[in-house]
């Protein structure tokens, strides 16, 4: 009995109604997992040395290493090379049949030194951390399509571990704490905390076109940018002399200059350094049956003193600074068609929770 007329299979569509997608159908995709796939894991090593000197200094040295054993890697089973551009970069296509597999690349290494000392009623602390972290995929999405497609790369699936999006290479923190009695025998405490750290890494990429060079199934804007060597770069066609002048002025005045004539690596650049200074003042008041604690928090004192300070300026994980022609990103000779430059693409002030503005908070609590 045909499926369409079988009353026990009423939910099935007759085979004659099925439609087999064509090879280029954007929805005819499949996803799979490598049968040998292993859950992400890493080898971790840590060593620390604590010292207390005769002068009362408490010093700590610490080293941490997190070496990838197995990490996540995505590939398109239909990935293929369509052509090669003048600079040697490949242009690729794909089917969107994403396969989840493993890579052994990636690591995180961190050094930390800290010191603590009491000077009577004053307590002082300072610590510095230097970190280097590398990975392949940012994994900022729960879907394979976006995890695969929203990863900055230079040549298709030929990817090596580069600096992580979320790495803070340098971080310095220092605190000062002073306790005295200004009202009878009740403690009055002043606490200052200062933090200074380097900005997170970001990539300079191309902009202005829809399909990525790395895979036509992916969105544009994630291809690491080729940096022209000059107005007469043989791998580039500028839309005009004015465009060439603007692009090269930007290149020569920034860190892009060290990559002239080549492709800027993923996360080769850092957002600006940022600093913060916070103050807390607490006053204890003894009630005989308990204690009232009044507190005043002043966060981002730097911004309070100067409106141009204490502001966190960051680039998103990619800055699409080199703009290609929307319809023809490269010509018949494989040369990039550059039509403009956007030096500040992706640069924004991070103030989601008030980090870039000062705040006052006054409150109290009662302890029985």
Residue ranges, per PLM feature:
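Outer-membrane beta-barrel and related beta-rich outer-membrane complex signature
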Residues: 1, 27-28, 60, 69-80, ...
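Solvent-exposed loop/turn elements at secondary-structure boundaries
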Residues: 1-99, 235, 256, 261, ...
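Short sequence motifs at beta-strands and strand-loop junctions characteristic
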Residues: 27-29, 35-41, 102-107, 116, ...
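Hydrophobic, lipid-facing positions within transmembrane beta-strands of outer-membrane proteins
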Residues: 33, 43-47, 107-113, 170-176, ...
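Transmembrane beta-barrel domains of outer membrane proteins
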Residues: 50, 114-118, 177-179, 282-284, ...
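Gram-negative outer-membrane beta-barrel transporters
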Residues: 60-203
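Extracytoplasmic gating/loop element in the C-terminal half of outer-membrane beta-barrel translocons
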Residues: 189-288, 319-348
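Outer-membrane beta-barrel "beta-signal"
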Residues: 352-368
């Amino acid at each position: 009995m045909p499926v369409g007329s079988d009353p026990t299979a009423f939910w099935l569509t007759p085979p004659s109604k099925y439609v087999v997608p064509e090879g280029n159908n954007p929805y005819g995709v499949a996803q799979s997992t490598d049968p040998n796939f292993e859950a992400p894991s890493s080898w971790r090593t840590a060593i620390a040395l604590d010292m207390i000197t005769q002068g009362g200094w408490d010093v700590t040295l610490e080293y941490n290493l997190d070496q990838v054993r197995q990490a996540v890697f995505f590939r398109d089973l239909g990935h293929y090379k369509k052509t090669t551009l003048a600079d040697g970069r490949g242009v690729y296509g794909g089917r969107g049949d994403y396969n989840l597999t493993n890579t052994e690349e990636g690591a995180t290494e961190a050094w930390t030194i800290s010191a603590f000392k009491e000077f009577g009623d004053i307590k002082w602390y300072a610590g510095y951390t230097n970190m280097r972290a590398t990975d392949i995929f940012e994994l900022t999405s729960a879907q394979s399509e976006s995890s695969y497609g929203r990863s900055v790369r230079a040549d298709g699936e030929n990817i090596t571990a580069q600096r992580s999006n979320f790495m803070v290479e340098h971080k310095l923190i220092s605190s000062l704490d002073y306790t005295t009695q200004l009202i009878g025998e009740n403690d009055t405490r002043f606490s200052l905390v200062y933090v200074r750290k380097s900005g997170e890494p970001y990539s300079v990429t191309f902009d202005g076109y829809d399909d990525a060079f790395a895979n036509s199934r992916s969105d544009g804007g994630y291809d690491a940018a080729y940096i022209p060597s000059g107005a007469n770069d043989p791998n580039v066609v500028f839309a005009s002399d004015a465009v060439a002048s603007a692009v090269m002025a930007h290149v020569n005045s920034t860190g892009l200059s060290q990559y002239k004539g080549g492709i800027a690596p993923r996360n080769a650049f850092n957002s600006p350094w940022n600093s913060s200074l916070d103050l807390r003042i607490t006053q204890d008041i003894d009630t005989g049956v308990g204690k009232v604690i009044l507190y005043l928090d002043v966060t981002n004192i730097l911004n309070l003193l100067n409106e141009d300070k204490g502001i966190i300026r960051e680039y998103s994980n990619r800055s699409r600074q080199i703009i290609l022609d929307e319809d023809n990103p490269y010509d018949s000779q494989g040369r990039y068609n550059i039509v403009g430059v956007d030096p500040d693409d992706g640069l924004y002030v991070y103030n989601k929770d008030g980090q870039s503005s000062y705040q006052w908070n006054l409150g109290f609590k009662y302890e029985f």
